Structure formats: structure tokens, C-alpha cells
Amino acid sequence: MKKFKYVIGVDEAGRGPLAGPVVAVGVMIHLKSQISNLKTTTQNSKLNKMFKELKIKDSKQLSLKRREEIFKLLKKHPRILWAKGMVSAKVIDKINIWEATKLAMKRSIKNLEKKIGKKFPKKKTLLIIDGNLKIDSGFIEQPIIKADQKISECILASIFAKVIRDRLMERYDKIYPKYNFKKHKGYPTKEHKRLITKYGACKIHRRSFKGVGGKRLSG
């Protein structure tokens, strides 16, 4: 495999819900404490050992409590650099969920560049994307099915994105308490669909999604 100066893993949370944003996180793991000497690998033995000890795996296989624990433990780890990108329900309705997912991922990379204070060189940066989606980022892209179970950067991106989105939906629950967003996080559960039918859609519902479109706007 070609050697890259930077390896970034990207994953998203919130592609399937009927409400709320789609959230993407880009993660880069570096072996040096100084960015100027940055060298990245998905085969970092120390981090792999830490992943094993912490029993870190794909966010979908972890409980909410465990995801929160891992996020709190690793969000400020000196070797883990990350940034988020979000796209609102309103924009999702305008451009569709696939384009919104790509946009969220691109925003996460741009925000990661801002965070470290430098641009990633296009030909020396490998972007590993969970799934089979290409996002036209300009970087060398490698979509990998189930990367969120195999690639350290994508595993972390998956966990971080899920935690960030869950927290956001819990905040929305306080603004729109009758929809119980805290429980289902906007996903199309029977309860959520029933509440949409009863109260209509609120401002963070995705009007272009089946089960929401055509429902009166509440509030």
C-alpha cells in the first residue's frame, strides 16, 4: 500500500432518523505529540493495545453508557485528533440525505484542518470512509465496508459521531418534549411515528422522509 503522511477515518451518525441532523466525525491518530512531526498509522501497536483493553468496537455494538465512557476518556487524548461536521434537517430536505452525509463528512475534514492549523496535502492524505460512499473530497478516498469495525480511526469516528448526535437529540428533547427525542433519538420507532401522527412534525423533522412528509407542522 502507498505510504501516506495523513490517514483520516470518517463515519457518520443519523442517516436514518426522521428528525435531527446528520453528524460526521473525522479522526486522525498521530504518533508524535507535535503536529509538525506527524506520522499516522492504523497499525499503532500502543493504541491497538488500548483499544483491546478498553474493549472498543463499533458504536452500534456498544451501550449508550459505554459510548459515553469511551468518548469522555478519549476526546482529549493527545494522539487522537478529531472534528465534527453537521448538516441540519432543513438542509437534508433540500439536498437529500446522501448529499447531506457527504457534506457533513467534508465539513468534518475542513474543521479538522482548522483544528490543527494546516491543510492536508491532497495526494498525501488517505481518507478512509466507512461504507461504500465516496464523498468527492479531493483527497485519496478509500471506502471500506464495516471500517467502523476494523479501522481504528473509523471505530473512533463512529463512536464520537454517535455520542455527539445523541447528546444533541437529548437537548432537542427539552425544546420539543412531547416527541420523546431523548428515548429514540429521532429514529423511526413505533412510538416516534405515533407521536408524529398525533402532534404533527416539528422544526427538526425531515419533511422529505417517508412518515414525516405531509404531516402538519407543529408549533
Residue ranges and their predicted role:
Residues 1-34, 45-219:
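RNase H-like, Mg2+-dependent phosphodiesterase core
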Residues 36-38:
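Conserved positions within tandem-repeat grammars
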